[in-house]
Amino acid sequence: MVVAKKSLGQHFLTDESFLDRIVNALPPLNPLKLVEIGVGLGDLTLKLLDRYPLKTYEIDSHLCEKMRSKLKAQKKPFKLELVEKDALFLKEEEPYFLISNLPYYIATRLVLNAFKDPKCRGLLVMTQKEVALKFCAKDSQNALSVLAHTIGNATLLFDVPPSAFSPPPKVFSSVFEVIKEPLKEKALASLAQAPFFEEALQKGFEMLEDFLKACFSSPRKTLSNNLKKSVSYREKLDKVLDFLALENQPTSVRASEIKDYLKLLNYLLKG
């Protein structure tokens, strides 16, 4: 019997109906490689291997050993490449699509890593419902939604109740997908001065992420007040006010009311 480790935030999805819904929600992958974070009890992994070759990152050596034993007992049409490694250090040389039931405590960081990785062309993941709602929120409601919609389209697919897991978490989970769009990535890469596109895209994402941290540092306060507290952006406050005037937005605007952060940051970088 496998005992979930609290230190790794393990809650294993065991409900067959939700496992099937996740697999069926995958978009057409050809020619993308499919990469999974976390093998868990192997239930999702085994279902994926009925349809696709798969590479899985798993930090728990005990779960890796259990998965190897299952594969010996169950022959699958496609092969699994099982990597015993922390997914925070995930690095692929070829374009891939990411799928995972992410541990709550590190889900946001792993999703942002995927956003930043030019080789990742999209993702289908499950997180705590509150986190999924932030990524999939429309317009500029929070920094995570701005980042998600700057690189592509984020869509909330369905909720998963605690009863679908072993052990059950205290909150609902949600499955969402983000499909990256090349034109949006090109606009983001234009923020940075770098000789290669992938390098420019990573740098542009980091620049926008840093700017959004300052803008949303106190969401209930005005954008101007937040930027006044920022060492990096307080000197550009006059340009921010100029931009707001050009966009016919009041100086009392909050961060969540800005319509186009990429346009604003481009304006600030011009001089």
UniProtKB/Swiss-Prot annotation:
GO biological processes: rRNA methylation
InterPro entries: KsgA/Erm (IPR001737), rRNA_Ade_diMease-like_C (IPR023165), rRNA_Ade_Mease_Trfase_CS (IPR020596), rRNA_Ade_methylase_Trfase_N (IPR020598), rRNA_adenine_dimethylase (IPR011530), SAM-dependent_MTases_sf (IPR029063)
SMART domains: rADc
Catalytic activity from the UniProt record: adenosine(1518)/adenosine(1519) in 16S rRNA + 4 S-adenosyl-L-methionine = N(6)-dimethyladenosine(1518)/N(6)-dimethyladenosine(1519) in 16S rRNA + 4 S-adenosyl-L-homocysteine + 4 H(+)
Domain of life: Bacteria
Enzyme Commission no: 2.1.1.182
GO MF terms held by the record: 16S rRNA (adenine(1518)-N(6)/adenine(1519)-N(6))-dimethyltransferase activity; RNA binding; rRNA (adenine-N6,N6-)-dimethyltransferase activity
Gene Ontology CC terms, in alphabetical order: cytosol
Keywords attached to this entry: Cytoplasm, Methyltransferase, RNA-binding, rRNA processing, S-adenosyl-L-methionine, Transferase
Binding site for S-adenosyl-L-methionine: 11, 13, 38, 58, 86, 101
This protein's record includes keyword NADP: no
Protein's cellular compartments: Cytoplasm
Function noted in UniProt: Specifically dimethylates two adjacent adenosines (A1518 and A1519) in the loop of a conserved hairpin near the 3'-end of 16S rRNA in the 30S particle. May play a critical role in biogenesis of 30S subunits.
PANTHER family, A to Z: DIMETHYLADENOSINE TRANSFERASE, DIMETHYLADENOSINE TRANSFERASE-RELATED
Family: Belongs to the class I-like SAM-binding methyltransferase superfamily. rRNA adenine N(6)-methyltransferase family. RsmA subfamily.
Name the record gives this protein: Ribosomal RNA small subunit methyltransferase A
